[in-house]
A protein has these predicted regions:
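Well-ordered alpha/beta subsegment
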Residues: 110-134
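Beta-strand/loop substructures that line and gate deep hydrophobic ligand-binding cavities in soluble
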Residues: 87-111
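Compact, glycine-rich, soluble single-domain proteins
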Residues: 29-33, 37-89
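A generic alpha-helix structural signal
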Residues: 25-29, 74, 125-128
């Protein structure tokens, strides 16, 4: 899927960050820690591509969440483990840093989550709003 096609997917949210990719990733990981969530992994996909002799724009995937919030979701909908822990992609799009993720309401719809369980994912929007705020 080309990046322009991804921008048309209503289930994917993309926001513009005023910081460079590395700065956005650093701010995100700091925010995750400050909120008491668990940082599971940070994958610098560009660095991995370079190790394979390939070129890729700056592309970093951050995996994080709260087992207290995610476990009930996975217990109710086991296939939701395909999308959990939560992931945020921080990437360079022709000199602009973008932050993309699967919308919490799209995840809730995909796995037919109750309103209570959907609420366990909803904080992602506020987190990314704060991330991209100047």
């Amino acid at each position: 899927m080309a990046e322009d096609e991804a921008g048309n997917d209503p289930g994917i949210v993309t926001k513009l960050s005023h910081l460079p990719v590395a700065g956005t990733v650093a701010k995100l990981t700091d925010m995750i820690s400050a909120k008491g969530m668990r940082l599971f992994a940070v994958i610098d996909q560009r660095a991995e591509a370079q190790q394979a002799g390939l070129d890729l724009r700056e592309t970093t995937l951050v995996f994080f969440g709260s087992p207290a919030a995610g476990t009930p979701v996975m217990a109710a909908a086991p296939l939701s483990a395909l999308d959990l822990p939560l992931k945020v992609l921080v990437w360079d799009d022709r000199g602009q840093t973008k932050v993309s993720y699967v919308a919490p309401d799209a995840l809730a719809a995909r796995y037919h989550l109750s309103a209570d369980l959907a609420g366990n994912l909803a904080g992602l929007n506020a987190l990314t709003d704060a991330l991209v705020a100047p």
